[in-house]
Design a protein with these regions (language model features):
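Contiguous, structured surface segment used for ligand recognition
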Residues: 1-64, 134
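Aromatic-lined carbohydrate-binding surfaces of glycoside hydrolases
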Residues: 70-189
Length: 189
């Protein structure tokens, strides 16, 4: 498109970068990639919400590749709605990672070998879709260290669980071995 090519040289070449110009004739936002364009829109939304839409040019990109949070704490668990709001917050603030690993999720930890019940699997799919819509990579984490046996059977159990999560549309994964003792902490095996 000729209108985008006109600004191509002004767009930062760093991943997730964008160029934005606000002038008397309108606003131009051009992203290095899809996420860069999304971030430019977030900057414009922020400026409008603060009533600060003034003539300007912005060339912006992240200095840190991974920006976000791990939900992997002990304590009062987040509700599904809270998780959705967190993902919205991450997207608005140009964070690109949300790692789902709450200690209260039994299928992430104590019952890691078992499949999620259908209703809970749908909630994870919803989180994953929302994250994608907000420019956030959704990582599903598994925490098998409490009772993993360093056997071919448990290796297969782990692979099978990850494949089930892949079947839900999830494409990024983490394997946690923190806060454990016993067999799971014996990495030499």
């Amino acid at each position: 498109d000729r209108s985008v090519n006109k600004f191509k040289k002004l767009v930062p070449q760093q991943q997730e970068g964008y160029y934005m110009a606000v002038g008397p004739k309108g606003v131009v936002i051009a992203g290095r990639d899809e996420r860069g364009l999304y971030y430019g829109v977030q900057t414009l939304r922020d400026m409008i919400s603060k009533g600060q839409l003034e003539t300007c040019t912005i060339q912006d990109w992240p200095d840190v590749k991974f920006r976000g949070a791990i939900e992997g704490f002990y304590g009062r668990p987040w509700s599904h709605e809270h998780r959705l709001r967190q993902i919205d917050f991450y997207g608005r603030n140009k964070m690109n990672v949300y790692i789902y690993g709450p200690k209260d999720d039994p299928y992430h930890r104590q019952h890691w070998r078992e499949a999620y019940p259908e209703n809970e699997a749908k909630l994870l799919q919803e989180l994953n879709v929302r994250a994608h819509q907000r420019g956030v990579n959704f990582y599903w984490a598994i925490h098998p260290g409490l009772d993993i046996k360093w056997t071919n059977e448990d290796r297969d159990n782990l692979v099978n669980k990850l494949e089930k999560m892949y079947g839900l549309g999830i494409r990024s994964f983490a394997v946690f071995f923190d806060d454990i003792s016993g067999e799971g902490s014996r990495g030499e095996k």
